[in-house]
């Protein structure tokens, strides 16, 4: 069985990735050490830099995840600042920002960064399109899941198993697996 160190302090992210990888015979090992996060408007350089930093620090191959929700009516905000906005404002205030907005389209994006020590990092994006609900719905998932609607249900309503089949993180991990398994 392959083992991959996944660097995140986020229990929800780790559980989602762990559950996806185990279906492919890969064991995810959580490392909560973190890494210096670039302040960028795009997720790709953040994930690439983080993966390279940790791979060289730990001297082993690692995977990191940088994710965000991009709301079109807010010009892509909060995007790469999603965690900060979630911590400071939370879903109720994001919904308040959306009051009166007709365009509720949004997308979740995850970029998986993978790097081996001394190598250049690789990035694997995944996107899922949806819209911002008018209220929080569902108790599943984490973060923005209760306000992100996909095919009529929020990620918070879908439950982990269903969400893990269609999520942005799933799509990014699938892109990674296509490369990893194809090249293994």
Curated annotation (Swiss-Prot):
Active site residues of this protein: 66 (proton acceptor)
Cofactor note: Binds 1 Mg(2+) ion per subunit.
Protein EC: 3.6.1.66
Cofactor needs: Mg(2+)
Pfam family, one: Ham1p_like
GO cellular component: cytoplasm
SUPFAM superfamilies reported for this sequence: ITPase-like (SSF52972)
Family stated for the protein in its record: Belongs to the HAM1 NTPase family.
Name under which the protein is recorded: dITP/XTP pyrophosphatase
UniProt organism field: Methanosarcina mazei (strain ATCC BAA-159 / DSM 3647 / Goe1 / Go1 / JCM 11833 / OCM 88) (Methanosarcina frisia)
Origin organism lineage: Archaea, Methanobacteriati, Methanobacteriota, Stenosarchaea group, Methanomicrobia
């Amino acid at each position: 069985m392959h083992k991959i160190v996944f660097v995140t302090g986020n229990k929800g992210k780790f559980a989602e990735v762990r559950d996806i990888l185990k279906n492919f015979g890969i064991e995810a090992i959580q490392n909560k050490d973190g890494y210096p996060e670039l302040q960028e408007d795009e997720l790709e350089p953040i994930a690439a830099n983080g993966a390279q930093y940790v791979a060289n620090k730990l001297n082993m191959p690692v995977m990191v995840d940088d994710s965000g929700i991009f709301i079109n009516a807010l010009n892509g905000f909060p995007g790469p600042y999603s965690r900060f906005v979630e911590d400071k404002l939370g879903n109720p205030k994001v919904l308040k920002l959306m009051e009166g907005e007709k365009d509720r389209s949004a997308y979740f994006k995850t970029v998986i960064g993978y790097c081996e020590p001394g190598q250049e990092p690789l990035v694997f994006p995944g996107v899922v399109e949806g819209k911002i609900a008018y209220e929080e719905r569902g108790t599943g998932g984490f973060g923005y899941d209760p306000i992100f609607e996909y095919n009529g249900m929020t990620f918070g309503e879908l439950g982990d198993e269903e969400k893990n089949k269609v999520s942005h993180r799933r799509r990014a991990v699938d892109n990674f697996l296509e490369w990893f398994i194809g090249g293994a």
